[in-house]
């Protein structure tokens, strides 16, 4: 049988709704709405045709009611999500919506619709003059200017940022303070400045000239200019270990723990914290464990302190300013600063009296001694290397403070060249080779040199005899020539020997100058690489006595002519000069060794026969007697050196008082 019209089930259709309402009315004792008359006689006439037995109208009513409830719930949920987001940035009240209005369920659909809402009941709004932000940034105790920024909403409502909205109870019913339909009047909302760090950071970010504003606030807060403590780095990628940082708008809680947060990254820290109109201002002198660029430092501090990189001033400190060093020293021993780690040496040097006395006196002889010991003769190398010693050497620091650095540098280079030239002239060839061996580390092997000579079909005994006469400067044996095809290792072999013995290289390209032979005046051995036909013709015409090893006259620039015995000369060429009829007078003056085979390399491109300074040292030590290299016993000093130690300053007697 078909089911009768209507239904006897509970909680379904329209009967379910009225049944639940009836139970609530009978059992809970809720107050009856004002639109119903309690004294009226119930005749039942108002219930005629109240329930439509047609299923179409029941379904339509149920669908419309569900849609209205769903819409109201979605609007309320969206308002809560938007409220949380706006509360984070605007510090709004938890009871107010982001638009400053309270959402209500539209009661026009049914007088009882609000009572069966699935959401929790509305709480009463409380009067709060000052809201406490819990966004994580904390509040600052420093007074800040009150800023009210009002923006027209989409429906004409007022949206306030940078402050909280005061919820005021005017005695009306709940939910009547505002609505979401946008038809209410746009009333002025009073904003009370929360004086929180996030609002203060917004003020700083709104400033057009942030750099100038931060410098001005720093000077007002600390009483001195930030530029008095730092020097300027134009590039953000220049690395340095010491940095001075001024950080604005820091959370007070985070500022208190900054010392602990920064400790794993630094060797020394000097931290000061004061309040400014933008929050807590941190001034810190940091020495990192390794060199860092400004970008790296800013990114690290921004991560630790939750402050934008644009709210920081980061520059390296002044390392030679007594005023800056004294500021760090005096504030470091006071209770305004927190200091950890060893004090940087530049602060100690500028604040200790003895260092100040030592830095004020520059001794040129000490600089010359340093350049002589380090075998420096170029002025640029001297200036750079000596400036690097300023942190540890008081004389170098005094050199940097002097206004006559260029004069001192030129005098030092000149004196060093004179001493070096005189020392070399006083040594014979044996002493000079021994001196060069003393400057080279151990660990060489003489076998690659011998194997390379055998590879080029050169008898080792013959080569030793020629080298012996060559080093002694024997007449007619004063010139060695390595000839052969290209890529046979002639220049590689000759240049390695010249590098070991610190000889001079002359180039025929400068032969048009009168001074192209001037390097021969300050060397023990000379070399000319890749002599051509024109070069051999020049030697045959003008330099026969030089190849003989006899005294020659050499013109020098800005100096008079000098007469000296020509040092041994080593030449490489692709031409066999002894077999060419154009130079018959050179055959008796040169000793020629042919290199017929191409120089070998392994599969990695490295030379099979490695010839370097260590191998040449081992070679001369091995063939010392065969080359007839002897030293007199009195040439060595008390410490066993092959020559006396050169000292420009008298020894100091260090004895206690």
UniProtKB/Swiss-Prot annotation:
<feature type="short sequence motif" description="Nuclear localization signal">
    <location>
        <begin position="86"/>
        <end position="88"/>
    </location>
</feature>
<keyword id="KW-1048">Host nucleus</keyword>
<dbReference type="GO" id="GO:0019079">
    <property type="term" value="P:viral genome replication"/>
</dbReference>
<dbReference type="GO" id="GO:0003678">
    <property type="term" value="F:DNA helicase activity"/>
</dbReference>
<feature type="modified residue" description="Phosphoserine; by host">
    <location>
        <position position="110"/>
    </location>
</feature>
<keyword id="KW-0067">ATP-binding</keyword>
<feature type="short sequence motif" description="Nuclear export signal">
    <location>
        <begin position="109"/>
        <end position="118"/>
    </location>
</feature>
<comment type="subunit">
    <text>Can form hexamers. Interacts with E2 protein; this interaction increases E1 DNA binding specificity. Interacts with host DNA polymerase subunit POLA2. Interacts with host single stranded DNA-binding protein RPA1. Interacts with host TOP1; this interaction stimulates the enzymatic activity of TOP1. Interacts with human SMARCB1/INI1 protein, stimulating viral replication.</text>
</comment>
<dbReference type="InterPro" id="IPR014000">
    <property type="entry name" value="PPV_DNA_helicase_E1_N"/>
</dbReference>
<dbReference type="Pfam" id="PF20450">
    <property type="entry name" value="PPV_E1_DBD"/>
</dbReference>
<dbReference type="InterPro" id="IPR014015">
    <property type="entry name" value="Helicase_SF3_DNA-vir"/>
</dbReference>
<keyword id="KW-0238">DNA-binding</keyword>
<dbReference type="InterPro" id="IPR027417">
    <property type="entry name" value="P-loop_NTPase"/>
</dbReference>
<dbReference type="InterPro" id="IPR001177">
    <property type="entry name" value="PPV_DNA_helicase_E1_C"/>
</dbReference>
<dbReference type="GO" id="GO:0042025">
    <property type="term" value="C:host cell nucleus"/>
</dbReference>
<keyword id="KW-0547">Nucleotide-binding</keyword>
<feature type="region of interest" description="Disordered">
    <location>
        <begin position="633"/>
        <end position="657"/>
    </location>
</feature>
<feature type="binding site">
    <location>
        <begin position="484"/>
        <end position="491"/>
    </location>
    <ligand>
        <name>ATP</name>
    </ligand>
</feature>
<keyword id="KW-0244">Early protein</keyword>
<dbReference type="GO" id="GO:0016887">
    <property type="term" value="F:ATP hydrolysis activity"/>
</dbReference>
<dbReference type="InterPro" id="IPR046935">
    <property type="entry name" value="PPV_E1_DBD_sf"/>
</dbReference>
<keyword id="KW-0378">Hydrolase</keyword>
<keyword id="KW-1017">Isopeptide bond</keyword>
<keyword id="KW-0235">DNA replication</keyword>
<keyword id="KW-0413">Isomerase</keyword>
<dbReference type="InterPro" id="IPR037102">
    <property type="entry name" value="Znf_lg_T-Ag_D1_dom_sf"/>
</dbReference>
<feature type="compositionally biased region" description="Polar residues">
    <location>
        <begin position="175"/>
        <end position="188"/>
    </location>
</feature>
<dbReference type="GO" id="GO:0030430">
    <property type="term" value="C:host cell cytoplasm"/>
</dbReference>
<comment type="function">
    <text>ATP-dependent DNA 3'-5' helicase required for initiation of viral DNA replication. It forms a complex with the viral E2 protein. The E1-E2 complex binds to the replication origin which contains binding sites for both proteins. During the initial step, a dimer of E1 interacts with a dimer of protein E2 leading to a complex that binds the viral origin of replication with high specificity. Then, a second dimer of E1 displaces the E2 dimer in an ATP-dependent manner to form the E1 tetramer.</text>
</comment>
<dbReference type="Pfam" id="PF00519">
    <property type="entry name" value="PPV_E1_C"/>
</dbReference>
<feature type="cross-link" description="Glycyl lysine isopeptide (Lys-Gly) (interchain with G-Cter in SUMO)">
    <location>
        <position position="565"/>
    </location>
</feature>
<dbReference type="GO" id="GO:0005524">
    <property type="term" value="F:ATP binding"/>
</dbReference>
<dbReference type="InterPro" id="IPR016393">
    <property type="entry name" value="Rep_E1_papillomaV"/>
</dbReference>
<keyword id="KW-0832">Ubl conjugation</keyword>
<feature type="region of interest" description="Disordered">
    <location>
        <begin position="155"/>
        <end position="188"/>
    </location>
</feature>
<dbReference type="Pfam" id="PF00524">
    <property type="entry name" value="PPV_E1_N"/>
</dbReference>
<dbReference type="GO" id="GO:0003677">
    <property type="term" value="F:DNA binding"/>
</dbReference>
<dbReference type="GO" id="GO:0006260">
    <property type="term" value="P:DNA replication"/>
</dbReference>
<dbReference type="InterPro" id="IPR046832">
    <property type="entry name" value="PPV_E1_DBD"/>
</dbReference>
<comment type="similarity">
    <text>Belongs to the papillomaviridae E1 protein family.</text>
</comment>
<feature type="region of interest" description="DNA-binding region">
    <location>
        <begin position="193"/>
        <end position="359"/>
    </location>
</feature>
<feature type="domain" description="SF3 helicase">
    <location>
        <begin position="458"/>
        <end position="608"/>
    </location>
</feature>
